[in-house]
């Protein structure tokens, strides 16, 4: 599997970059900060949605000023092209895709961040931990694979997760503790179950005793109940007799009292009949009096009607005079009314033009004020800064800044070489001090004590020289850093001046444009106002005439409804009323000078006297009717008394015997009450016991249900315990480490056989932190830290590839980020040779560097440089 291409948009320092990888060894070169490592970050982000740098949030990966970043990676695997597209920030994860490219046609395989990551692992067999620990090599970290090799291997193999799994605080132990707690809980439940069963047996015995006691009470109750029913029946019969006895006595007494009262009422019958005959004679005069009263009232109403009509006649005469005067005034105002209507019509026609005239006048006034303000701003605005001169100054300053950056990078590179040389000499000095015997650890030749001391002294002298150079270069770099800081400040200041000048120029040009537009609009409005002024003058003149005529117009409207027809109608009404009044007066002439009201009062007084006698007559009729009724009632009551007396004799009721029966009934009720009370008490106890037994049965059933799982939990606990033991270091972990050790060693030695090295084989010990050993041709076993720099780099690269190949079957590419950091010239040349040799093992190598010497190793060169705040890509050659 190899990387064919990556497209970067708004990612870190890249605006829009398209990088193709066409060579076997692709060298990406550029100054520090040019955006080289950003390409490796983009590859990592494409594969795992994570960059290699420590970005706290995905927004940090987006280029400043942009809202979204997109990275598209093209991979070739087994003859197929896969396109992986990733987006940042997280709100765009749903747009992540992986597609298969066939004949320029894309077929989307998966969509969404999580699904795409799973598909990459499934299709390409890429593991994030393995890649980042082996074939993606960070800056100056080629040999870091030697450090803590067991820990690195465990991390790659996910053994650290196995250790966490079986840890005393891990998930297996946590589950075991939960199961054990459950087993302890079930043991307590078993104890509670036994207690519940004992309680159930005890309560069942109590229930049987209560049932027997209830049976005895039921027998006694049945016997007493029969006695009670007999006495109740007898008591009910006596109660009925008593009730009827009381009713009969009460009725007899009442009937006797009623007869006495009725006889008192009948004694005045003869006197009342004589009084009735006398009243009937007096009442005959009433009808004549009523007839005379009605005639008088009719005459009285007609006189009132005549008086009302005379009032109406008077009102009509007044209205008639008023209307005649108003009609005369209306005729005088008619000409002014017509003139006002005519002017009103003309004003309505001119209204729209007048509104337009006023609107344009207001607009003209507003525009002239605005024009005056803009002309004042133009006269106060001064454009004194030359933008072209500022551009030239900024260009010169940026060139100076780039020169200083290049100078600093060159010094930093030389300083790195010095540090690398110092480190190598210190290691060599340390190795010489550790050597036992007289054999050189590097070449295997004989080494005398004098020769050893001579080498040590030479190394110490060389270290002193290098230390002086180190201090000198640091001072130079600090001096250049100061100059770079000053240049950056000047550039920022000039950039701000340029931005202000551009804004001022834009504002000035905008004001000139506004001035021209306003003048044009003012001219157009003035022309239109001049055209409308003739209508405006006419409108003002007519408005004045309208104002003068309006009072007469409004007065005319008051008389608008006054017509000759209305006057003629009033005259007709006047004649009719005069005729009607004359006819009425002719009919009531006989009553005209009489006091009709007094006459009516006299008649009414006599009628009232007669009505009083009528009322008295009605009262007498009522009394006589009552007397007849009373006479009949006396006869009925006497007959009823005879019947009731006969019934009382037949009833045969004895009050003393009735009281004896009641006492016997009360005694039996008390006995039955005591029995029922005892039964209620026993039934309550019975219900409580039955509920307790039912509850205990359910409780026991629940305990039994829960205890079913006890054996399963014990079995599960034992299995987890065994699993935790098997996951220990001396079992599964040891098996995994030994299996991988064999695969890695075979692959490592197979790869190293293609390099020209002075040892026969290399051994890996994952239990040793420095567990890499090389065997010389003489069979000597040397730790990796005693080997030369070139040999260590060769083994480090081979080990990385071997681990990756063992865990991912196939390794298609190797990425080296700034591999020459801290290397001197000699070790750089060694690295170039090693890279060339590595091509035989891995089909694609990508080298990121600022070191021009590494161009010798590449067959496809990609150069990056920083322009402003953006990285720019340029392909140099493809030899």
From Swiss-Prot:
InterPro entries assigned: P-loop_NTPase, Rad50/SbcC_AAA, Rad50_ATPase_archaeal, Rad50_ATPase_DNA_repair, Zn_hook_RAD50
Record-linked Gene3D superfamilies: Helix hairpin bin, P-loop containing nucleotide triphosphate hydrolases
Cofactor section: Zn(2+)
Stretches assigned to the Zinc-hook domain: 394-492
GO BP, one annotated term: double-strand break repair
Induction: Part of the nurA-rad50-mre11-herA operon, these genes are cotranscribed.
Coiled-coil intervals, chain numbering: 184-304, 342-436, 502-722
This protein's UniProt keywords: ATP-binding, Coiled coil, DNA damage, DNA repair, Hydrolase, Metal-binding, Nucleotide-binding, Zinc
Residue positions binding ATP: 32-38, 139, 786-791
Note accompanying the cofactor annotation: Binds 1 zinc ion per homodimer.
Binding site for Zn(2+): 440, 443
GO molecular function terms attached to this record: ATP binding; ATP hydrolysis activity; zinc ion binding
NCBIfam families: Rad50_Sulf
Subunit structure: Homodimer. Forms a heterotetramer composed of two Mre11 subunits and two Rad50 subunits.
Family per similarity comment: Belongs to the SMC family. RAD50 subfamily.
Cited PANTHER family: ABC TRANSPORTER ABCH.3
Chain's role: Part of the Rad50/Mre11 complex, which is involved in the early steps of DNA double-strand break (DSB) repair. The complex may facilitate opening of the processed DNA ends to aid in the recruitment of HerA and NurA. Rad50 controls the balance between DNA end bridging and DNA resection via ATP-dependent structural rearrangements of the Rad50/Mre11 complex.
UniProt free text on domains: The two conserved Cys that bind zinc constitute the zinc-hook, which separates the large intramolecular coiled coil regions. The 2 Cys residues coordinate one molecule of zinc with the help of the 2 Cys residues of the zinc-hook of another Rad50 molecule, thereby forming a V-shaped homodimer.
Protein's name according to its UniProt entry: DNA double-strand break repair Rad50 ATPase
Taxonomic lineage from the root: Archaea, Thermoproteota, Thermoprotei, Sulfolobales, Sulfolobaceae
């Amino acid at each position: 599997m190899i990387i064919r291409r990556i497209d970067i948009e708004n990612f870190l320092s890249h605006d829009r970059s398209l990088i193709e990888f066409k060579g076997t060894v692709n060298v990406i070169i550029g100054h520090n900060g040019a955006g080289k490592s950003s390409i490796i970050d983009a590859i990592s982000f494409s594969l795992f949605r994570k960059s290699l740098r420590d970005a706290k949030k995905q927004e940090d990966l987006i280029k400043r000023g942009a809202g979204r970043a997109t990275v598209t990676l093209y991979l070739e695997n087994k003859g197929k092209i896969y396109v992986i597209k990733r987006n940042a920030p997280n709100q765009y994860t749903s747009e992540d895709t992986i597609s298969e490219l066939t004949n320029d046609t894309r077929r989307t395989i998966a969509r969404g961040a999580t699904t795409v990551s799973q598909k990459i692992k499934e299709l390409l067999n890429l593991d994030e931990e393995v890649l980042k620990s082996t074939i993606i090599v960070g800056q100056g970290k080629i040999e870091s694979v030697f450090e803590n090799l067991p820990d690195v291997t465990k991390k790659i193999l996910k053994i650290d997760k196995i250790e966490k799994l079986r840890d005393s605080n891990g998930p297996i132990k946590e589950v075991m503790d939960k199961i054990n707690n459950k087993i302890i809980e079930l043991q307590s439940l078993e104890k509670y179950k036994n207690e519940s069963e004992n309680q159930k047996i005890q309560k069942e015995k109590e229930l049987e005793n209560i049932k027997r006691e209830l049976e005895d009470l039921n027998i006694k109750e049945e016997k007493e109940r029969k006695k009670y029913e007999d006495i109740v029946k007898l008591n009910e019969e006596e109660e009925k007799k008593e009730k009827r006895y009381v009713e009969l006595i009460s009725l007899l007494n009442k009937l006797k009292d009623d007869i006495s009262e009725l006889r008192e009422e009948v004694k005045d019958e003869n006197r009342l009949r004589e009084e009735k005959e006398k009243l009937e004679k007096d009442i005959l005069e009433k009808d004549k009096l009523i007839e005379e009263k009605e005639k008088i009232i009719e005459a009285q109403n007609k006189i009132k009607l005549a008086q009302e009509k005379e009032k109406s006649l008077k009102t009509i005469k007044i209205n008639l005079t008023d209307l005649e005067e108003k009609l005369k005034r209306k005729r005088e105002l008619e000409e002014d009314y017509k003139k006002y209507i005519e002017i009103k019509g003309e004003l309505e026609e001119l209204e729209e033009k007048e509104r337009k005239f006023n609107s344009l006048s207001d607009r003209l006034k507003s525009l002239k004020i605005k024009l005056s303000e803009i002309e004042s701003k133009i006269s106060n605005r001064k454009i004194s800064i030359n933008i072209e001169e500022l551009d030239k100054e900024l260009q010169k300053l940026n060139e100076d800044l780039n020169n200083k950056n290049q100078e600093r990078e060159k010094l930093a590179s030389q300083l790195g070489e010095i540090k690398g040389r110092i480190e190598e000499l210190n290691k060599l000095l340390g190795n010489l001090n550790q050597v036992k015997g007289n054999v050189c650890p590097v070449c295997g030749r004989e080494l005398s004590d004098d020769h050893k001391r001579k080498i040590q002294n030479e190394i110490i002298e060389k270290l002193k020289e290098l230390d002086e150079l180190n201090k000198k270069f640091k001072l130079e770099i600090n001096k250049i850093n100061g100059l770079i800081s000053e240049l950056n400040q000047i550039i920022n200041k000039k950039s701000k001046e340029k931005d202000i000048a551009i804004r001022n120029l834009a504002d000035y040009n905008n004001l000139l444009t506004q001035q021209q537009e306003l003048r044009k609009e003012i001219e157009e409005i003035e022309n239109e106002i001049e055209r409308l002024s003739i209508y405006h003058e006419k409108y003002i003149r007519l408005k004045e005439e309208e104002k003068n005529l309006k009072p007469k117009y409004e007065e005319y409207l008051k008389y608008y409804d006054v017509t000759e027809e209305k006057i003629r109608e009033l005259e007709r009404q006047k004649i009719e009323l005069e005729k009607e009044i004359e006819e009425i007066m002719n009919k009531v002439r006989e009553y005209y000078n009489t006091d009709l009201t007094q006459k009516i009062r006299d008649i009414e007084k006599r009628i009232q006297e007669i009505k009083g006698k009528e009322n008295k007559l009605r009262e007498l009729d009522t009394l006589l009717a009552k007397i007849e009724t009373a006479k009949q009632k006396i006869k009925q009551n006497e007959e009823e008394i005879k019947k009731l007396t006969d019934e009382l004799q037949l009833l045969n009721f004895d009050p003393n015997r009735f009281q004896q029966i009641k006492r016997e009934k009360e005694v039996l009720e008390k006995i039955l009450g005591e029995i029922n009370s005892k039964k209620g008490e026993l039934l309550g106890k019975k219900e409580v016991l039955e509920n307790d037994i039912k509850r205990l049965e359910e409780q026991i059933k629940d305990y039994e249900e829960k205890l079913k799982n006890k054996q399963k939990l014990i079995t599960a606990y034992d299995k987890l315990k065994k699993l935790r033991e098997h996951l220990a270091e001396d079992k599964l972990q040891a098996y995994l480490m030994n299996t991988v050790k064999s695969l890695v060693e075979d692959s490592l030695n197979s790869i190293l056989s293609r390099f020209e090295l002075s040892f026969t084989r290399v051994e890996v010990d994952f239990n040793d932190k420095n567990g890499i050993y090389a065997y010389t041709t003489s069979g000597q076993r040397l730790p990796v830290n005693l080997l030369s720099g070139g040999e260590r780099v060769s083994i480090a690269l081979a080990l990385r590839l071997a681990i990756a190949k063992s865990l991912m079957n196939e390794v298609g590419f190797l990425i080296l980020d700034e591999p020459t950091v801290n290397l001197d010239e000699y070790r750089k040349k060694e690295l170039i040779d090693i890279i060339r040799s590595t091509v035989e093992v891995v089909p694609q190598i990508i080298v990121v560097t600022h070191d021009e010497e590494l161009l010798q190793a590449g067959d496809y060169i990609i150069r990056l440089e920083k322009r402003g705040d953006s990285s720019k890509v340029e392909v140099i050659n493809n030899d």
